[in-house]
Amino acid sequence: MNKQTVLYAVLAAALGAASHTVAAETSPRIGVQLWSVKDEIKQDFEGTLTKIARLGFQGVEFAGDFGPYKSNPAALRSFLDKNKLQCAGAHVGFDQLADARLEATTAFYKTLGCANLVIPMDARGASVEGSTAMSKELSALSSKLAPKGMRIGYHNHAQEMAGEVGSTPWDVIARNTPKASIMQQDVGWTTHAGKDPVAYVYKYPGRTVSTHYKAKFAPGTTGTPIIGQDRTDWAGLTRALREVGATQWIIVEQEEYPNGMGQLDTVAASLKGLKAVLAKMPAK
């Protein structure tokens, strides 16, 4: 076995031993954004998701790669069920939700049991004017998805957090979309933009239905981009999600892989750090 395989095996054993206890005692549920392991799922989709389940994740958020199940969502649902994984959500583009494709897209995700469809990024999110226009499109989609038992959401990068708190593009989107729509805060990008992710959960209660736990650093600071080895107040953030976020899913996401670590190894390390935080908090 190579070094990365050995590291995964060690982390899987440690995390797996505690996974049932953590899953039973914690809320929100814990998932992983599959973009974090995009190279590994291209090489072995089923094997990688099986390993994700063994680490103790309760769900996966899709980002457009469905391996051999691209045209067979029912079989993918069976595979997820077999591995006790839920669909925590999916990142989809506006083009996939255009009128001509809406029914096919929503039917695919409903088969997976996926209720949360999130726009991962849009160039209009870089400005107040663009975000105002985009909010109208998000609001229209919210109305179309609600009868299907689904929600639309939007995911931030640093561009949506530019400007003064209260007048950022993120604030504009929050104020101009229905309360049922998801403000999927990416904690890493919020931090990287110099804003407080905890404050934003409290600012828009009930809107953080899912959120990305990603370790990044505020301007002028550095560190290791792994949950628990960084500077983020993960306990305070989790407390806010439980108190006011109406949060269903904490979704671990990795886009940086330090010290030559593999993608799945890094995800496992962040999950280990997250579970260490949760273990010190009151169960809920």
Where are these regions (language model features)?
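Histidine-acidic metal/acid-base catalytic patches
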Residues: 3-4, 24-55, 113, 165-182, ...
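Bacterial N-terminal signal peptides
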Residues: 8-17
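Sec/Tat signal peptide C-region and signal peptidase I cleavage site
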Residues: 19-23
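Active-site-proximal loop/turn and secondary-structure-junction residues that shape catalytic pockets
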Residues: 36-38, 64-66, 93-96, 123-125, ...
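Extracytoplasmic low-complexity repetitive segments enriched in small/polar residues
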Residues: 40-42, 68, 142
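Active-site acidic/histidine proton-transfer and metal-coordination neighborhood
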Residues: 50, 58-59, 79, 86, ...
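Conserved beta-strand positions in the central sheet of alpha/beta enzyme cores
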Residues: 61, 89-91, 118, 153, ...
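Glycine-rich, proline-tolerant flexible connector loops at the mouths of alpha/beta enzymes
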Residues: 61-78
